[in-house]
From Swiss-Prot:
Entry binding sites for L-aspartate: 124, 128-129
Cellular compartments per GO CC: cytoplasm
Family: Belongs to the argininosuccinate synthase family. Type 1 subfamily.
NCBIfam families linked to this entry: argG, PRK00509.1
Nucleotide-binding is among the record's keywords: yes
Source species of the chain: Pelobacter propionicus (strain DSM 2379 / NBRC 103807 / OttBd1)
Family matches, as Pfam families: Arginosuc_syn_C, Arginosuc_synth
Protein name stated in the entry: Argininosuccinate synthase
Subunit structure of this chain's protein: Homotetramer.
Encoding gene, per UniProt annotation: argG
Reaction(s) catalysed (UniProt annotation): L-citrulline + L-aspartate + ATP = 2-(N(omega)-L-arginino)succinate + AMP + diphosphate + H(+)
Binding site for ATP: 14-22, 41, 122
HAMAP family documented for this protein: Arg_succ_synth_type1
E.C. designation(s): 6.3.4.5
GO MF assignments: argininosuccinate synthase activity; ATP binding
Length: 408
């Protein structure tokens, strides 16, 4: 055993209960001879968490934590991100990306509580999650030791993993494994790998979990009203809900109508392209509703500046920089812009589409029908438009004159 391994006595493992992290748990015990604390975060995975405690203990965990973080997840991570209207490469609502900082945060809290000198995760050396987890770890403890088995061990094939599991008494699922991997929380479920690596092949219908096929969704549209306060959704159809309850409810409504499916070939942080298929029914509805209320309450120039920051904000979340000073700076600016975002959006849900059909704000509306009408009013003199246009066209007219002069 190397000195580095001898220095590690207590490890907190981010444990999902799946075959890979079960093998990692046993591998940590075998290779390091250390105490292993297994930690699973309940972010809304549902039934996936039911067997986790028993499986972790059976595999050799000394202590098991299963923490319900659903409200914190939506309130402190999803909602701030949605106040920014963050979207990565025009399609991805960052459901996996935004979950990792919270898992890392709680994992480090457990490490401090349990006196652990190292943390471990099951992310591969080719993916984004290794970066997201470890940037979070170092934020909370710059000196923490990190064990990332996928970057060091020799179990480099699925068969090698299965052989190791059988050798160490870890149950291997006897049912045929679905030919893709998935990750689920309250915001979304993602699918990647396996048959999805053929970028031309359509994702099979049996893959989808949260959403009805749009063509099989109800033939009658459903209308939903979502109320916002300071940029955060607080009620659906007049019923107040907690953040987690609200997102779960929108997931149910959106799922019924086939809303929120995305098939994307995205650029990973490490440089390669990767295909991901996502279901984000509630998040898709929430973002559309939020933008609708912004349309009636937010100043044009404030919106223009904020919109210019969305790609950078989304990149920071995607790349794992949630705890960075630059993300916090952007968040402060964005949150200041949300003080006026108070109102209600009315949306129409129908066969995969989510469309705004109305918006209102009793306290912060900047829309005045008297000003917007084509009828005469006391505020706007239409003749003033001529001077406005001539001033704004000055640079264009000068450019045209200069180009004409060059041709002479």
């Amino acid at each position: 055993m190397t000195q580095q391994k001898m220095d590690i006595k207590n490890v907190v493992l981010a444990y999902s209960g799946g075959l890979d992290t079960s093998i990692i748990l046993k591998w940590l015990k075998n290779e390091y001879g250390c105490r292993v604390v297994a930690f699973s975060a309940d972010l809304g995975q549902g039934e996936e968490l039911d067997p986790v405690r028993e499986k972790a203990l059976a595999t050799g965990a000394d202590v098991v934590y299963i923490d319900d973080l659903r409200e914190e997840f939506v309130r402190d991570f999803v909602f701030p991100m949605f106040r920014a209207n963050a979207i990565y490469e025009g399609h991805y609502l960052l459901g996996t990306s935004i979950a990792r900082p919270l898992i890392a945060k709680r994992q480090m809290e457990i490490a401090a509580k349990e006196g652990c000198d190292a943390v471990s995760h099951g992310s591969t050396g080719k993916g984004n999650d290794q970066v997201r987890f470890e940037l979070g770890y170092y934020h909370f403890n710059p000196n923490i030791k990190i064990v990332a088995p996928w970057r060091t061990w020799d179990l480099n094939s699925r068969q090698a993993l299965i052989d190791y599991a059988k050798k160490n008494g870890i149950p291997v699922p006897v049912t045929k494994k679905r030919p893709w991997s998935s990750d689920r929380n309250l915001l979304h479920i993602s699918f990647e790998g396996g048959i999805l690596e053929d970028t031309w092949a359509e994702a099979p219908e049996e893959m989808y979990v949260l959403t009805t096929a749009p063509e099989k969704a109800p033939n009658k549209p459903q209308y939903v009203e979502i109320e916002f306060k300071n940029g955060n959704a607080v009620a659906v159809d007049g019923e107040k809900m907690t953040p987690a309850q609200l997102l779960a409810h929108l997931n149910y409504l959106g799922g019924q109508h086939g809303i929120g499916r995305v098939d994307l070939l995205e650029n990973r942080s490490v440089g390669m392209k990767s295909r991901g298929v996502y279901e984000t029914p509630g998040g898709t509805i929430l973002r559309e509703a939020h933008m609708a209320v912004e349309q009636i309450t937010m100043d044009r120039e404030v919106m223009r500046i904020r919109d210019g920051l969305i790609p950078e904000y989304a990149r920071l979340v995607y790349a794992g920089y949630w705890f960075s000073p630059e993300r916090e700076m952007l968040q402060a600016l964005i949150d200041d812009s949300q003080k006026c975002v108070n109102g209600v959006a009315r949306l129409k849900l129908y066969k995969g589409y989510c469309r705004t059909v109305g918006r209102k704000s009793d306290t912060d509306s900047l829309f005045n029908q008297d000003f917007a009408t084509f009828e005469k009013d006391q505020v706007y003199n239409q003749a003033d438009a001529e001077g406005f246009i001539r001033i704004n066209s000055l640079r264009l007219r000068i450019r045209s004159m200069m180009q004409a002069a060059k041709k002479k």
